[in-house]
């Protein structure tokens, strides 16, 4: 039981790490969300993104 809980915690930590690296701010300046769609498509493979503080954030 103790080993199972340790493995579960390790799995959760690894999952969080992978998710935070995959999505986030990219080095593209913007003034509107539509400017981020093509850049996010190139970086993450998904066109989902928005302009936040004059920088693109991809999802």
Swiss-Prot record:
InterPro entries: Scorpion_toxin-like_sf, Scorpion_toxinS_K_inh. SUPFAM superfamilies: Scorpion toxin-like. The record marks 50 as: Basic residue of the functional dyad. Keywords: Disulfide bond, Ion channel impairing toxin, Neurotoxin, Potassium channel impairing toxin, Secreted, Signal, Toxin, Voltage-gated potassium channel impairing toxin. Residues 1-22 form the signal peptide. Disulfide bonds join 30-51, 36-56, 40-58. GO terms for cellular component: extracellular region. The record marks 59 as: Aromatic residue of the functional dyad. Pfam families: Toxin_2 (PF00451). GO terms for molecular function: ion channel inhibitor activity; potassium channel regulator activity; toxin activity. It is found in: Secreted. Expressed by the venom gland. The keyword Disulfide bond applies. Negative results: does not inhibit large conductance calcium-activated potassium channels (KCa1.1/KCNMA1). Has the structural arrangement of an alpha-helix connected to a beta-sheet by disulfide bonds (CSalpha/beta). Weak inhibitor of voltage-gated potassium channel hKv1.3/KCNA3. Belongs to the short scorpion toxin superfamily. Potassium channel inhibitor family. Alpha-KTx 16 subfamily. This is Potassium channel toxin alpha-KTx 16.4. It comes from Mesobuthus eupeus (Lesser Asian scorpion). The lineage of its organism: Eukaryota, Metazoa, Ecdysozoa, Arthropoda, Chelicerata.
